[in-house]
Swiss-Prot record:
This is 6-phosphogluconolactonase. Belongs to the cycloisomerase 2 family. One of its GO terms (cellular component) is cytosol. The keyword Hydrolase applies. Catalyzes the hydrolysis of 6-phosphogluconolactone to 6-phosphogluconate. The lineage of its organism: Bacteria, Pseudomonadati, Pseudomonadota, Gammaproteobacteria, Enterobacterales. The keyword Cytoplasm does not apply. It is an enzyme of class 3 (hydrolase). Keywords: Carbohydrate metabolism, Glucose metabolism, Hydrolase. It comes from Buchnera aphidicola subsp. Acyrthosiphon pisum (strain Tuc7). GO terms for biological process: glucose metabolic process; pentose-phosphate shunt, oxidative branch. It catalyses: 6-phospho-D-glucono-1,5-lactone + H2O = 6-phospho-D-gluconate + H(+). Its EC number is 3.1.1.31.
Length: 334
């Protein structure tokens, strides 16, 4: 299966498209201008569409992905603020846009061609709304408020309207700054990375008396035995096998590997690796064979091979990219 890598370069105002070979060798095949600075990108695989959040004109550009991975611009959709995170519901009928600077989460229907329409709901006063992601098993949207040290929970109705759950808020540690979120493949466990205190929270989601509950079961540092004052954590991802989790910090320029306990799904720190300067974004391919980290300040990205047995990373190569790479995605072409 052919794989391509998309890199969003904010200051260069472009998206680069790279081929990724099984060996880990990569080559640039396309560079497409974005008519503005770019931040989040995301893909709906079954539609072969890529969505990019653009500012300062605050819009989402929809691109089609052809059989070779090349992008072609299809549409522009206005949004009411700067996009920081883009995600979708399970059926890919609605697009969720988080805005850290404008403090909101918006819901936009996708038409039959996958084009975002005007938002049908905007929830304001979510201070520092940095990310929002849907738990498909429980039909709950987790909306992260970095500045409030909390996570809001919403059910998604059939009509695309968000409504608060019974337990409508999760509190993280004070001044922790929750930033990004991922789910275990079984969807029963949640991992959130805290930008400001250098920790990861592990949450368990379950039903009790037919009511969905979420409880914190672990808080662990991204760096073993280094409890320092300054952290600047950014991204977090898990392998599709559910055995390994990775998290990075921009202050220390590291990416850490955790093993996931197969009995309780808590994290066990394994190792940290020095990586590119200011690692803002990284991604893992669907086969769990490669991990790529983009250095926002170094204007480079590094590709690692992943050990199937331990999750350890082995450097393969470093490539130069555009100015300020802020988002990276690995996409398997159908």
């Amino acid at each position: 299966m052919k794989q391509v890598v998309y890199i969003a370069n904010s200051e260069s105002k472009n998206i680069e498209v790279w081929n990724l070979c099984k060996s880990g060798k990569m080559n640039l095949i396309q560079k497409i201008e974005t008519d503005g600075k770019i931040q989040p990108i995301n893909i709906i695989q079954k539609r072969n569409l890529l969505y990019a959040g653009i500012f300062p004109d605050n819009k989402i550009i929809t691109y089609s992905i052809n059989h070779n991975g090349f992008l072609e611009k299809k549409n522009e959709s206005n949004i009411p603020g700067k996009a920081n995170y883009i995600s979708f519901d399970k059926k890919k009928e609605f697009l969720f846009c988080s805005s850290y600077h404008s403090n909101f989460i918006s819901v936009s229907p996708l038409n039959k061609f996958g084009i975002p329409q005007n938002p049908i709901q905007i929830i304001y006063n979510i201070e520092g709304c940095h990310a929002a992601k849907m738990n498909y098993k429980y039909n709950i949207l987790f909306v992260i408020s970095l500045k409030e040290d909390c996570i809001y929970l919403y059910y998604l109705t059939d009509f695309g309207i968000l409504k608060s759950t019974e337990q409508n808020i999760l509190h993280t540690q004070k001044k922790s700054g929750p930033r990004h979120i991922i789910f275990h493949p079984n969807q029963d466990f949640i991992y959130t990375i805290n930008e400001l205190n250098g920790t990861i929270d592990v949450w368990k989601i379950y039903k009790k008396n037919n009511v969905i509950k979420v409880k914190n079961i672990q808080n662990i540092h991204v760096l073993k035995n280094r409890f320092l004052k300054d952290y600047w954590c950014s991204d977090i991802h898990i392998t599709s096998c559910g055995r390994f989790l990775y998290a990075c910090d921009r202050f220390f320029n590291i990416i850490s590997l955790f093993h996931i306990n197969q009995n309780d799904n808590k994290l066990v720190f394994f190792k940290s690796y020095d990586t590119e300067e200011q690692p803002r974004s990284f991604n893992i391919n669907s086969h769990n064979t490669h991990l790529i980290v983009a250095g926002e300040k170094s204007n480079t990205f590094i590709i690692y091979g992943i050990s199937n047995s331990t999750g350890e990373l082995k450097k393969i190569n470093v490539y130069s990219t555009g100015q300020r790479p802020v988002w990276i995605l690995i996409h398997a072409l159908c």
